[in-house]
Amino acid sequence: NCRSLVWATGGPAGMYLDSVYPAGHWGSTGAALEAGAAGQNLTEWQFGLASVSPRWNVSGTYMQALPRFLSTAPDGSDPREFLLDYFGDPASMCNHIFRKGYEWPFDVTKVRCGSSILDVLVFLETKRKGRRVVLDFLENPGGGELDAAALEPQAREYLTAAGACFGRPIDRLLQMNRPAVDFYRSRGVDLTKEPLEIALCAQHNNGGLKV
């Protein structure tokens, strides 16, 4: 019979298999809806690339360091740099990977001419082809050395200003954001030695209970 009630439980994150929400974050919106509360914008979900274990968004410098996207068989064998099948050249692929760092989350307007095509390609690789996708920070996309001159000006100038226009993805990530590497190491994944499995994950719900 109270006049106001604060129902701070979070959204129904547990309804998605691939989710960046903490595993125990089930949400209790349904209980309020069953009790008669009205919902609003419940279909407005955001999706983006995130690591599977631990659950964490791989935006920002994780992408701007330009890691390789590898597709593997379920047992980890048969690694393939599958993005090369979709981009005309390694430079175009790298530019899309770099932009994924700040064009977040998935945006339908950025599929044809933006980085959201990466979200679609990861989804197709994992859910349609039944493979796994990992980020490899130990080798440059396309193999060989980073060709900074082939990057679009925004990416090249950003990396140059950050003192990270060199080396391998892990070298660039350590230069730009060492805590990003420490975060995974403290949770059992050493990016200096091993790849990071990712998926297209539910990341945020813009709706909830109508107030």
Predicted feature locations:
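Short, glycine-/Ser/Thr-/acidic-enriched flexible segments
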Residues: 7, 11-13, 74-77, 140-142, ...
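Short, surface-exposed linear patches
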Residues: 26-31, 61-64, 92-93, 194-196
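FAD-site-proximal beta/loop scaffold in flavoenzymes
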Residues: 1, 193-211
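Glycine- and acidic
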Residues: 11-14, 161-166, 193-195
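Glycine-rich loop(s) and the adjacent beta-strand/alpha-helix scaffold that form part
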Residues: 4-57, 69
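Hydrophobic alpha-helical segments, especially N-terminal targeting/anchoring helices
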Residues: 35, 71-72, 209-210
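Predominant activation on well-ordered alpha-helical scaffold segments within soluble catalytic domains
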Residues: 3, 26-33, 177-185, 206
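An anion/pyrophosphate-binding glycine-rich loop and adjacent beta-alpha core
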Residues: 38-190
